[in-house]
Swiss-Prot record:
Catalyzes the transfer of a ribosyl phosphate group from 5-phosphoribose 1-diphosphate to orotate, leading to the formation of orotidine monophosphate (OMP). The lineage of its organism: Archaea, Methanobacteriati, Methanobacteriota, Thermococci, Thermococcales. 5-phospho-alpha-D-ribose 1-diphosphate binds at R93, K94, K97, H99, E119, D120, V121, T122, T123, T124, G125, G126, S127. It comes from Pyrococcus horikoshii (strain ATCC 700860 / DSM 12428 / JCM 9974 / NBRC 100139 / OT-3). This is Orotate phosphoribosyltransferase. Pathway: Pyrimidine metabolism; UMP biosynthesis via de novo pathway; UMP from orotate: step 1/2. GO terms for molecular function: magnesium ion binding; orotate phosphoribosyltransferase activity. Belongs to the purine/pyrimidine phosphoribosyltransferase family. PyrE subfamily. NCBIfam families: pyrE.
Amino acid sequence: MKMKDELINLIINEGCIKFGHFVLTSGKESNYYIDIKSLITNPKALRIIAKLIKEKAEELNLNYDKIAGPELGAVPIATALSLETNKPLLIVRKKKKEHGTGKVIEGNVQKGDKVLLVEDVTTTGGSVIRAAKILREHGADVVGIFVVVDREEGAKENIEKEGFKFYPLVLVSELFKAAGISKDQS
């Protein structure tokens, strides 16, 4: 079984597709929710995700020297990828710390760093765009944004409009097809 198919099966079998009424981070309302956070506590799933991102980045000849993820959902993914690639980790906070060092980025970000940014789920891409812009403001070059699941609700277009390259591992349409769910059911 291909790793991507294995990931899709894990997402389905771990019950990550939930139905009901949900308000997403983007503020949009939805009748389904992709709960990747329950998946990214699974070491097997994290290994698969990290290997898929690493392989795809290699296929694309992406040159990067650091891995970043916005808190909270992307941190385990970024950590797994950091371990898989042996590249340093950066964590982009949702907001600047009010205490201690007051950092918005944890880790050593420097001007000219080539950063691979990861995210768990994208809808409009707002959260990951914000993280990418913060990295850019600190002198980093975001060479690619990888997401585990893209809901196909504008993230690709919004991210690319901001000048970033976007690489989803799985599209929600692929998940629904594999789970035997029609878009109308969702």
